[in-house]
């Protein structure tokens, strides 16, 4: 079992569930915009949020931001040790630094500040911060992260979270497998510079999913260029798909010429309406009744299209026939029945 560390009220590692993180895209010193974005992330299910700290104004804004949010806040500092200390003084629940960019004395000061507040430090490496380069870049990546860990250990600091990321899926997997064998600290998973939309989702799902299936990884961030809320939604879906998080899974047929309903839009609408439900339930959206009910019989709840409407089925049993405009309303009714049954 991995060592556990506490980030605000969230435990990472040990027997704690895998947590979902994201990072704001706003200028941190713009408190109003930053808080607004964090609240959107909270509503999506984000459990830890990271902000970029590029100057004193950003560091000092942390205190005001924390007063208005519910989830732990991580300060991301690249070079200036003074910004790390100032972020800690202003209430950061964790800092992310690169100890290799600091002198021994400066690192001592940062460690002393973190110890004084009882907060952890995340260290690690990505392809842009590799200390040495050989033919095995994944190993160079992992060894660079281990060097960062050793620098903190030399200062007597052990509340550490480790991260090794590449934009390459296989490098990310190999580097994290190597790290997992070398240290007992919690591991932060992600694919850096993953790209936009489908590309980022595919890369992250493969790398993160593979590692979690091997019991490697304690907290995740799905990096997607653009709105960070999407990162949280995809991260939660990865955990639900792996059985590591309770939630509603919407399955849908790939569609063919027999489809009598707009499967894609119906599935999206159901996901949006039921994403908040924290129970392990499966909802099927099937285009027709020819194969739909049979293929969706493993679902707890489902809908199959008819030429002039749809049928609602629960655990493979048809409950009623409805017109298409009432599908969502009736699904909500049967979902509430299922939730009451689960609670009993």
Curated annotation (Swiss-Prot):
Its cofactor is [4Fe-4S] cluster. Binds 1 [4Fe-4S] cluster. The keyword tRNA processing does not apply. Pfam families: GcpE (PF04551). It catalyses: (2E)-4-hydroxy-3-methylbut-2-enyl diphosphate + oxidized [flavodoxin] + H2O + 2 H(+) = 2-C-methyl-D-erythritol 2,4-cyclic diphosphate + reduced [flavodoxin]. It comes from the Bacteria. Gene3D superfamilies: Dihydropteroate synthase-like (3.20.20.20), Sulfite Reductase Hemoprotein, domain 1 (3.30.413.10). The keyword Iron applies. InterPro entries: Dihydropteroate_synth-like_sf, IspG_bac, IspG_bac-typ, NO2/SO3_Rdtase_4Fe4S_sf. Its EC number is 1.17.7.3. It is an enzyme of class 1 (oxidoreductase). GO terms for biological process: isopentenyl diphosphate biosynthetic process, methylerythritol 4-phosphate pathway; terpenoid biosynthetic process. [4Fe-4S] cluster binds at residues 253, 256, 288, 295. GO terms for molecular function: 4 iron, 4 sulfur cluster binding; 4-hydroxy-3-methylbut-2-en-1-yl diphosphate synthase activity (ferredoxin); 4-hydroxy-3-methylbut-2-enyl-diphosphate synthase activity (flavodoxin); iron ion binding. Pathway: Isoprenoid biosynthesis; isopentenyl diphosphate biosynthesis via DXP pathway; isopentenyl diphosphate from 1-deoxy-D-xylulose 5-phosphate: step 5/6. Keywords: 4Fe-4S, Iron, Iron-sulfur, Isoprene biosynthesis, Metal-binding, Oxidoreductase. Belongs to the IspG family. Converts 2C-methyl-D-erythritol 2,4-cyclodiphosphate (ME-2,4cPP) into 1-hydroxy-2-methyl-2-(E)-butenyl 4-diphosphate. PANTHER family: 4-HYDROXY-3-METHYLBUT-2-EN-1-YL DIPHOSPHATE SYNTHASE, 4-HYDROXY-3-METHYLBUT-2-EN-1-YL DIPHOSPHATE SYNTHASE (FERREDOXIN), CHLOROPLASTIC. NCBIfam families: ispG_gcpE (TIGR00612), PRK00366.1 (NF001540). This is 4-hydroxy-3-methylbut-2-en-1-yl diphosphate synthase (flavodoxin). It comes from Thermotoga maritima (strain ATCC 43589 / DSM 3109 / JCM 10099 / NBRC 100826 / MSB8).
């Amino acid at each position: 079992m991995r060592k556990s560390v506490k980030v605000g009220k969230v435990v990472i590692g040990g027997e704690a569930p895998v947590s979902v993180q994201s990072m704001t895209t706003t200028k941190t010193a713009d408190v109003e915009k930053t808080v607004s974005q964090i609240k959107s992330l909270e509503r999506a299910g984000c459990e830890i949020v990271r902000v970029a700290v590029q100057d004193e104004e950003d560091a000092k804004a942390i205190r005001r931001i924390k007063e208005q949010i519910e989830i732990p806040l991580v300060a991301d500092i690249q070079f200036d040790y003074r910004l790390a200390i100032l972020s800690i003084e202003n209430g950061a629940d964790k800092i992310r630094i690169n100890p290799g960019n600091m002198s021994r004395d400066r690192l001592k000061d940062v460690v002393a500040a973190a110890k004084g507040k009882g907060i952890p430090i995340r260290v690690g490496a990505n392809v842009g911060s590799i200390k040495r380069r050989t033919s095995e870049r994944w190993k160079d990546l992992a060894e660079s992260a281990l060097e960062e860990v050793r620098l903190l250990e030399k200062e007597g600091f052990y509340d550490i979270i480790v991260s090794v990321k590449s934009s390459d899926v296989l490098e990310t997997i190999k580097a994290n497998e190597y790290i997992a064998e070398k240290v007992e600290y919690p591991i932060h998973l992600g694919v850096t510079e993953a790209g936009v939309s489908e590309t980022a989702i595919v890369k992250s799902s493969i790398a993160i999913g593979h590692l979690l299936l091997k019991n490697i990884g304690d907290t995740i961030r799905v990096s997607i260029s653009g709105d960070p809320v999407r990162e949280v939604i995809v991260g939660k879906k990865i955990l639900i798909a792996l059985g590591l998080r309770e939630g509603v899974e919407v399955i849908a047929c790939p569609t063919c010429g027999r489809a009598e309903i707009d499967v894609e839009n119906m599935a999206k609408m159901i996901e949006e309406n039921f994403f908040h439900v924290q129970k392990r339930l499966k909802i099927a959206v099937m285009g027709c009744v020819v194969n739909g009910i049979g293929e969706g019989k493993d679902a707890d709840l489902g809908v199959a299209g008819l030429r002039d409407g749809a049928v609602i089925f629960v655990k493979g049993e048809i409950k009623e026939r409805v017109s298409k405009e009432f599908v969502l309303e009736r699904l909500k009714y049967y979902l509430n029945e299922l939730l009451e049954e689960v609670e009993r």
